[in-house]
Amino acid sequence: WVLALFTTIVVLFLFLPLVVVVAFSFNSGYSAFLWGGFSTAAYGQAAHDTTLVTALKISLEVAVATGLLSMFVGLVGGLAATGTRWTHRLLFVLFIIILATPEIVGASGDLLWFVTLGVSNGFVRLIIAHSIFGSALTALIVRGRALGLEPSVFEAANDLGARTPTMVRTIAVPLLMPALIAGGLLSFTFSLEDLVTSVFVSTAQTTPLPVYILASLHSQFHTDIFAIAVFIFISTTLLFLAALAAMGGGSRSRMRRGLRVLGATGAAEGG
């Protein structure tokens, strides 16, 4: 019973804040923190609040761009960090440093960098700043996956006459796709909820949702904020489950399919 009690406490500690947010999104009270009865009016108010919807749209656009950019940079960086030379190991250490650096330090550096270079576009600043963390995270995930690949696969591809770019395209990338999807999804999620970096690099014309919520705390915090939070929570959860379903299994089939493609390519070239 001790283990059951401890498990219950841990579950409540982790999920009770989410339950409170969902419950208070149906609050009919004027204040978000005082229960006034059950109502779905907050969802209608959130949908018609143009400022709130604009902030959500900016966050989603930046998060999507961050996820895609992090997947590309993370793939290249992750493969480069799998080598045994000192430069490859240095790249791996740099990725670790990026993740270990306090966010406020990195955000300050990003702001100084953008001001020095004269980058004033808020979208560009947000995407680049968020992608620095996302790319490092994706690169480490890709590296871990790449180190677990069987060398015999690439030896077989080499016996079929495949060149390195062909092996990367037909073997490595399909096998690394689960890691890429995971890295892109995590980068999307971290970008969507990032506050510290967004406060430093965003502009008045490109205010993402976390910055908007922070500003609302200093004025009037209404229940429509909770409604948007529930929407984001459900959306990201469904997206995460879909990614898990896409990543589940299929590694061996992707491997066999890649080798068949290489075999067909080699036969065609030989003919």
Regions found by a protein language model. Give the residues of each.
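Transmembrane alpha-helices
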Residues: L5-L18, S131-I132, A139-V142, E150-P151, ...
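A structural signal for multi-pass alpha-helical bundles of membrane permease subunits
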Residues: F15-G29, A107-G118, L185-F190, A243-L244
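Membrane-interfacial helix termini and adjacent extracytoplasmic/periplasmic loops
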Residues: A32, T40, T87, I104-G134, ...
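Interhelical loop and adjacent transmembrane-helix boundary motif
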Residues: Y30, A42-T51, S191-G249, G271
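Transmembrane alpha-helix signature in integral membrane proteins
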Residues: F26, T50-A81
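Loop-to-helix entry region at the N-terminal start of transmembrane alpha-helices
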Residues: T54-E61, G109-L137, P178-A179, G184, ...
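Short loop segments and helix-boundary regions at transmembrane helix junctions
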Residues: G77-F95, N121
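C-terminal transmembrane helix and the adjacent membrane-cytosol boundary/short C-terminal tail
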Residues: W1-L5, A81, R85, R143-F154, ...
